[in-house]
Design a protein with these regions (language model features):
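Charged- and aromatic-enriched interaction segments used to assemble
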Residues: 94-243
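Short intrinsically disordered coil segments
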Residues: 55-60, 106-112, 228-234, 268-270, ...
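Beta-strand-rich assembly/attachment modules of structural machines
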Residues: 1-125
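Short linear motifs in intrinsically disordered
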Residues: 45-60, 201, 238-243, 318-323
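Acidic, small/polar-enriched beta strand-loop surface segments
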Residues: 2-6, 11, 184, 214-356
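Short, well-ordered strand-loop elements centered on a beta-strand within folded domains, enriched
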Residues: 89-95, 205-217, 260-264, 358-367
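Oligomerization/assembly interface segments of phage tail-like spikes and tubes
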Residues: 28-49, 87-98, 189, 253, ...
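Short beta-strand and beta-hairpin "edge-sheet" elements
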Residues: 64-94, 331-363
Length: 370
């Protein structure tokens, strides 16, 4: 195991700075459809962590750090902040997709019937075309059958409940005067299409390659070959959510438009509980189809079923580090005093790894909720 520091040169290349950074308390986070990151500290001060010119190798938005375990890169991120406290230096690094956050669009873009994944690639092309803006991230060529953007027109329809809906639709646009956060634009596309994404870092000879993996409609697979079992590779009994505090058997989604012209969707399912309705407002939902998708997703998350949201696992033959990734579905087998024996398929949303101890904390949710 080792920690590596490089300098991102801004032209798509990077220069090695150190192959043995003495980091302590390291945690790497690999998110599904999120930036992830890396955090750690150095204490006491290490004089050798300098360039040939005597300058510190750690510079925010210039230095990249990687965790390598058994020759495989298990995490990589860009240094976004550092704080000195006496002899200790704390490092806070954001995953590569975090590079889009708060960055504005500086041109004009308008498309009709465009694949959202093409727009997602365009956002990265626009960002990495800037002087010193190329971080060497290659974006997948994945496509989808979804199309966004229409000729300008007044859209009218009647819902199944007999209500009239009217709103104006038009091209999908990006503009210097309104698009101020490319990261939010990218995530909005991922949610509405939908598609998943995550970043991988791999050795290619002596060069580190960065790839933004896109998956329509999602990434991951059901892993029948792996399992998490209490007493085998689960360190402690997972907390099981039994409350059902946000339970609803019906969801009302209100989207773009005002009053009777508002985009609307109602989705419900029969249950053995009392009828309850949850209301979700999201003005970014421009179509009935988008509102339907949002309502169904919200409904699945509110059915009040037994759920597990976090597990603490160790490296084990039943599920070794690197064998599973965010997006994968894995069976959890545990026991709870109130719920009894629990066997639950969950989807991995995030993996936070301690490379030193080879322990991981996984954020998960039952597969029916995503």
């Amino acid at each position: 195991m080792r920690y590596i520091a490089t300098r991102l040169n801004g032209d798509g290349t990077e220069t090695p700075l150190s192959f043995d950074v003495p980091l302590q308390g390291v945690r790497t986070t690999d998110d599904l459809s999120g930036p992830g990151g890396l955090e750690g500290s150095i204490s006491p001060e290490v004089q050798r962590l300098q360039t040939a010119g005597g300058e510190p190798i750690f510079h925010a938005w210039s230095t990249a750090l990687y965790a390598e375990v058994d020759g495989k890169l298990r995490g990589g991120a860009i240094l976004a902040g550092l704080k000195a406290q006496g002899p200790s230096l704390s490092l806070d690094c954001v995953g590569f997709t975090g590079y889009l956050k708060d960055e504005p669009y500086t041109a004009d873009y308008s498309r009709v019937a465009v694949d959202p994944l093409d727009v997602a690639r365009h956002l990265w092309e626009h960002r990495q075309a800037k002087t010193n803006g190329n971080i060497g991230l290659t974006v997948d060529t994945t496509t989808s059958p979804i199309r966004i953007g229409t000729p300008v027109k007044e859209t009218s329809f009647t819902t199944g409940a007999g209500e009239d809906v009217n709103f104006e639709s038009g091209p999908y646009t990006l503009a210097w005067w309104k698009t101020r956060d490319l990261g939010k634009e990218f995530d909005d596309l991922a949610t509405s299409t939908p598609f998943d994404y995550r970043v991988s870092h791999e050795w290619d000879g002596e060069t580190i390659r960065h790839r933004l993996i896109l998956g329509y409609p999602n990434l991951g697979a059901r892993r029948e070959d792996l399992r998490f079992v209490l007493g085998e590779n689960l360190f402690q009994r997972p907390t099981i959510d039994l409350t059902g505090g946000d339970y609803a058997s019906e969801v009302l989604v209100l989207g773009a438009g005002e009053g009777r012209k508002m985009v609307r969707s109602v989705q419900s399912t029969p249950t053995r509980r009392l009828h309850r309705t949850a209301v979700l407002e999201d003005k970014s939902l421009q179509s009935k189809a988008a509102a339907d998708r949002a309502a169904l997703l919200e409904l699945r998350s509110r059915l009040g079923e037994v759920d597990i949201t976090e597990v603490d696992v160790t490296n084990h033959p039943h599920a070794r580090i690197g064998e599973y990734s965010p997006g994968d579905e894995i069976l959890i087998q545990t026991r709870h005093d109130w719920a009894g024996e629990v066997s639950l398929w969950v989807r991995i949303l995030s993996i936070t790894l301690d490379p030193q101890t080879e322990r991981s904390v996984l954020s998960v949710t039952r597969v029916e909720r995503v």
